[in-house]
């Protein structure tokens, strides 16, 4: 019976483990400074991975950094020179407030708008939490 249990346990780990690891990864942000511009090269890929609208994320970055910006494909250009550390701090704040579930700490969430209120709905535990409007 122990051998059968261990075989089933190994099979379960093989089926669940890769997907669980992929879901828990938060992508790194790639920031490049140019004269009078700051470019985030993998912005579209990050938005897709976090299940967020690119323009919603861009709006957050523009408000937090107080500079205008444009989205072109996967690239987000901020029209102002900002330190990569500052941009990474804003990215971490976005993840904290608009991506991570406060109940179970999962990033498997979606941001819904219900009337004038934004609600963070967790797909892992089912919790719904109101968040600050953008």
From Swiss-Prot:
Q: SUPFAM superfamilies of this UniProt entry?
A: Translation initiation factor 2 beta, aIF2beta, N-terminal domain, Zinc-binding domain of translation initiation factor 2 beta
Q: Which UniProt keywords apply?
A: Initiation factor, Protein biosynthesis
Q: What is the lineage of its organism?
A: Archaea, Thermoproteota, Thermoprotei, Thermoproteales, Thermoproteaceae
| Entry's Gene Ontology molecular function annotations | translation initiation factor activity
Where in the sequence is the signal peptide annotated? Answer: none
Quaternary assembly: Heterotrimer composed of an alpha, a beta and a gamma chain.
Q: What PANTHER family would the database entry show?
A: EUKARYOTIC TRANSLATION INITIATION FACTOR, EUKARYOTIC TRANSLATION INITIATION FACTOR 2 SUBUNIT 2
- Name by which UniProt lists this protein: Translation initiation factor 2 subunit beta
Has UniProt tagged this entry with the keyword Signal? Answer: no
Give the matching Pfam families: eIF-5_eIF-2B
Q: Which organism is it from?
A: Pyrobaculum calidifontis (strain DSM 21063 / JCM 11548 / VA1)
């Amino acid at each position: 019976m122990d051998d059968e249990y261990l075989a089933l346990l190994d099979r379960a780990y093989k089926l669940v483990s890769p997907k669980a690891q992929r879901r828990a990864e938060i992508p790194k942000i790639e920031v490049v400074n140019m004269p009078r511009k700051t470019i985030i090269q993998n912005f579209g890929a990050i938005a897709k991975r976090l299940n967020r609208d690119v323009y919603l994320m861009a709006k957050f970055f523009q408000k937090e950094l107080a500079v205008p910006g444009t989205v072109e494909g996967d690239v987000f250009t901020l029209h102002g020179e900002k330190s990569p550390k500052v941009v990474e701090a804003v990215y971490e704040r976005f993840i904290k407030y608009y991506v991570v579930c406060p109940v179970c700490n999962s990033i498997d969430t979606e941001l819904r708008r219900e009337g004038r209120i934004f609600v963070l709905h967790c797909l892992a535990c089912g919790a719904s939490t109101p968040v600050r409007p953008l």
